[in-house]
Each structure stands twice: as C-alpha cells, then as structure tokens.
C-alpha cells in the first residue's frame, strides 16, 4: 500500500469554535468580556503574539492575524499611561482585523478599551492563568488543530503499548485481525477509517473517524460496537503510529523477508515508519505474529536487541570456532599419530 496522498490542513477556524473547544479540551477557563459575533472572526495562524511593540506605536511588523495575548507587561504598560495616550496605544491594535484578544492573570482591562474592542468587533477573553501557561496550552491546541492530516483505509490497534497500523487490500481480514487482537486484551483505536495527524516533525498521531468511532464491520457478521461488547478497556482515542503491518495475498513469486536484517520503511505524511509485510496463507496465525512484531519493536527500542542480528552473530561465532578447531586438529595430526 502506498501512502502517497497529499496531507490536508485546516485553513482556519472561527473564534466561536476556538472558544468552545479550548474550554472543553483544556483547563484554561476562558471567560468572555464582551458580546460580539465570534463567527465573523477567524483564526488562521497557529502562533500567538504579544503586541508590546504595537502598543508602543511600532506596527510595521505587527502580526495582527494571530491571537493577541495581553499579559502583565502589556497591561502595566497600558495602565501607566494617561487616558488619552492609553486609548491611542490600544487603537494600534484594534484598528487591525485581530481574531481575538486574551488577557491573562485576571488583569483588568479599562472599560473604555473594552468598548473600543467591542466597537471594532474584536472578541475579548480573560483567564486566570499566567501568560506562560496560557501560551503553552493555546499553542498546543492550535498546533493540533492546524496540523497536517490524512485519512487512510486500515485498522489501528494498541498492541502491548505499540501503535500498530494494519493496512492492505479490502477483504484480507484487517478488521478480523484487529477484533482478534482486542479479544486478546489489546486496544482498538480505529477501524476502516484511520485519521493520522502529523504533530511536529516526526510524530504521527492516529485516531478514529468521529462518525464511525469504535464500531467495526465484520463481513458475515455485521456491525460490532467494540466499546459495548468488550468494555472501556478495549478502546483508546489516540495512539502514535509506530509500526505499519501490510497484509498481502500470498504470491510464491515474491521474495518475502525471512531473516529481518533488512528493515523496510514507508513514508506517511513525510515521516518514515517501519513497515512489515505479512503474506496471508492457510495456517498462519496473523494475530500472534502481530503481537511478536510489537514485542520485537519494544526489544529494539528499549534494549537495542534485534533477533536476526543476534542469530547472525551466533552463526559467525560458530563458524569461527569450527575453523579454529579444524586448524588445531590439523596441527596435532602432523605431530602425533592418532591412528
């Protein structure tokens, strides 16, 4: 299977969506300071901005399209100004189409300045959190929402804590294998439609389609609700993609990996991921093999142990030992008559 689909990316979100979801997902507790139409304001940038220079009058490089954070420094600067100068300083912000303003550490905003923001249609929020914590939480939220993503056909299972993604042609039994893994105590992340987000440069986070959730379709049986049938222990919402297992139809002309010395990889959204290709033929217990794939991954990651390399080293050592024994026997034979 080729993961060559171009990654997608959310282009923007409304401030209303931002406010509702960040309060649900994070312990940030934003409160509204004014009533404006938050649907008309859109956030298009995952970075935040502290407009200290803009308040001081330097707006040449003002990144006004970002969420603006007013912390202790900005608020104390405004508060030390007289009323007229304070309004002129705040005008340097509200004259631009700013998505929203967030005031941290429960600082009080001058009612006159709040009226200016309301008149300009700019939502203003306040939080008790410090600027550092607010920036950390909001940045993490925006990075997640604006990350590159794509949806793939397959199943995603947490096997011994290793994120294993099962892919392959339709009808090969990916869902059945995933169901068998769940029955053996592992956890289903997604089936049929796996949504993968790239977080940072090298981390792939898999989750399920929000409509399908943890339902599975098993040919001949129908729809299975994994959460209802196996309990909460059988599911999880997200998991890092660490290994891709491709189920393939058996082809006697194809050269399959037998030792495991050559590690194959595949690229998902530009990130290299180990790839294991498993041919399907009668008599193979695919579920157990996938468990061993996960265990081998853990051995390699945490102890650097690779079974194929260990066996290769033992064979080399055995050959060297036999060569030494042969040389020693030949030397003794010439000096002593064993017959």
Swiss-Prot record:
Classification via Pfam families: Hpr_kinase_C, Hpr_kinase_N
Record-linked InterPro entries: HPr(Ser)_kin/Pase, Hpr_kin/Pase_C, Hpr_kin/Pase_Hpr_N, P-loop_NTPase, Ser_kin/Pase_Hpr-like_N_sf
Positions annotated as active site in the UniProt record: 153, 174, 192 (proton acceptor), 258
Catalytic activity of the protein: [HPr protein]-L-serine + ATP = [HPr protein]-O-phospho-L-serine + ADP + H(+); [HPr protein]-O-phospho-L-serine + phosphate + H(+) = [HPr protein]-L-serine + diphosphate
Broad EC category: transferase
Keyword Metal-binding recorded: yes
One Gene Ontology MF term: magnesium ion binding
Cofactor: Mg(2+)
Region annotation (Important for the catalytic mechanism of dephosphorylation) ranges: 279-284
Region annotation (Important for the catalytic mechanism of both phosphorylation and dephosphorylation) ranges: 216-225
Enzyme Commission (EC) number: 2.7.11.-, 2.7.4.-
GO biological process: regulation of carbohydrate metabolic process
PANTHER family in the cross-refs: HPR KINASE_PHOSPHORYLASE, PROTEIN YJDM-RELATED
Swiss-Prot/TrEMBL domain comment: The Walker A ATP-binding motif also binds Pi and PPi.
Protein name: HPr kinase/phosphorylase
Lineage: Bacteria, Pseudomonadati, Chlorobiota, Chlorobiia, Chlorobiales
Name of encoding gene: hprK
């Amino acid at each position: 299977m080729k993961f060559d689909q171009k990654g997608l990316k959310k282009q923007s979100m409304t401030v209303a969506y931002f406010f509702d979801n960040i309060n649900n997902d994070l312990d940030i507790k934003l409160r509204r300071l004014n009533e404006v139409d938050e649907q008309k304001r859109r956030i298009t940038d995952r970075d935040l901005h502290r407009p200290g220079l803009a308040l001081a009058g330097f707006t040449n490089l003002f990144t006004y399209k970002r969420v603006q954070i007013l912390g202790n420094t900005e608020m104390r600067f405004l508060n030390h100004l007289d009323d007229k100068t304070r309004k002129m300083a705040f005008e340097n912000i509200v004259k631009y189409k700013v998505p929203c303003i967030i005031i941290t550490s429960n600082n009080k905003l001058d009612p006159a300045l709040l009226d200016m923001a309301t008149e300009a249609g700019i939502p203003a929020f306040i939080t008790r959190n410090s600027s550092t914590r607010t920036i950390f939480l909001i940045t993490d939220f925006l990075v997640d929402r604006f990350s590159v993503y794509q949806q793939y056909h397959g199943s995603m299972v947490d096997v011994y804590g290793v994120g294993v993604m099962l892919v392959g042609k339709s009808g090969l039994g990916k869902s059945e294998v995933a169901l068998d893994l769940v029955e053996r105590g592992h956890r289903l992340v997604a089936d049929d439609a796996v949504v993968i987000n790239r977080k940072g440069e090298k981390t792939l986070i898999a989750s399920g389609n929000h409509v399908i959730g943890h339902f599975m379709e098993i040919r001949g049986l129908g729809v299975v609700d994994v959460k209802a049938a196996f309990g909460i222990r059988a599911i999880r919402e997200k998991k890092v993609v660490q290994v891709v297992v491709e189920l393939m139809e058996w082809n006697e002309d194809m050269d399959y990996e037998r030792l495991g010395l050559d590690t194959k990889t595949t690229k998902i959204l530009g990130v290299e991921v180990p790839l294991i290709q498993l041919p399907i033929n009668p008599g193979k217990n695919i579920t157990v093999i996938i468990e061993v794939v996960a265990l081998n991954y853990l051995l390699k990651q945490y102890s650097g142990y690779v079974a194929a390399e260990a066996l290769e080293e033992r064979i080399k050592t055995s050959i060297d030992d036999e060569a030494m024994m042969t040389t020693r026997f030949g030397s003794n034979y010439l000096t002593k008559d064993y017959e």
